[in-house]
């Protein structure tokens, strides 16, 4: 379960940001997790419950925004969200190899005090 190490790193970044802004407590973390990131949101939530203990995020809420895969067709230049793992453009029926969104794992925002 690599989500534990990912959450440890994410929480370390959040704590560093909180300290840089003079905060003593993290109330909320918002993550953007791409559908194709290889990260399981429920495992990330479980990892957060474990790694936040005895930190300034001990009482924090974790919000996860799941980001769908968005492709861009090289043929007709339209963006689309594929319906399966074959990225066929619904506009021109060609296969796309360009994923524009949906692979990320980002710390999108923090609520601090």
Swiss-Prot record:
Chain sites annotated for binding Ni(2+): 2
Disruption phenotype: Disruption of the gene abolishes hydrogenase activity but does not affect urease activity. The hydrogenase activity of the mutant can be increased by the addition of nickel.
Binding of Zn(2+), residues: 73, 76, 89, 92
Keyword Metal-binding: yes
Gene Ontology BP annotations: protein maturation; protein modification process
GO MF: nickel cation binding; zinc ion binding
Keywords: Metal-binding, Nickel, Zinc
Pfam families hit by this protein: HypA
Keyword Hydrolase recorded: no
Family under the similarity heading: Belongs to the HypA/HybF family.
HAMAP family for this protein: HypA_HybF
Role, per record: Involved in the maturation of [NiFe] hydrogenases. Required for nickel insertion into the metal center of the hydrogenase.
Protein name per Swiss-Prot or TrEMBL: Hydrogenase maturation factor HypA
Gene: hypA
